[in-house]
Swiss-Prot record:
Its main location: plastid. GO terms for molecular function: structural constituent of ribosome. Gene3D superfamilies: 3.30.1320.10. PROSITE patterns: RIBOSOMAL_S16. This is Small ribosomal subunit protein bS16c. Keywords: Chloroplast, Plastid, Ribonucleoprotein, Ribosomal protein. It is found in: Plastid, Chloroplast. GO terms for cellular component: chloroplast; mitochondrion; small ribosomal subunit. It comes from the Eukaryota.
């Protein structure tokens, strides 16, 4: 099963995240199947590849709770 989850990047105390599609059996920072976005919680910036996200969701990918909250704030589920 494929999930949309956050992959941590950045320095100590300054996290940034990439939103990735990854198999559930892989670790958090493992090899991603596809990178579909970027999230910076300190600057509250989000960059999303909406067509790729919608395609993955149609093919059965499940977002984690945090990623689904980010997608709702960006208005992806309204499209």
């Amino acid at each position: 099963m494929v999930k949309l989850r956050l992959k941590r990047y950045g320095r100590k105390q300054q996290p940034t995240y990439r939103i990735i599609a990854i198999d559930v059996r892989c670790r958090r920072d493992g090899k991603a199947l596809k990178e579909v976005g970027f999230y910076d919680p300190l600057k509250d910036k989000t960059q999303l590849n909406v067509p790729a996200i919608l395609t993955l969701l149609q093919h059965g990918a499940q977002p984690t709770d945090t990623v689904s909250h980010i997608l709702q704030k960006a208005g992806v589920f309204e499209k």
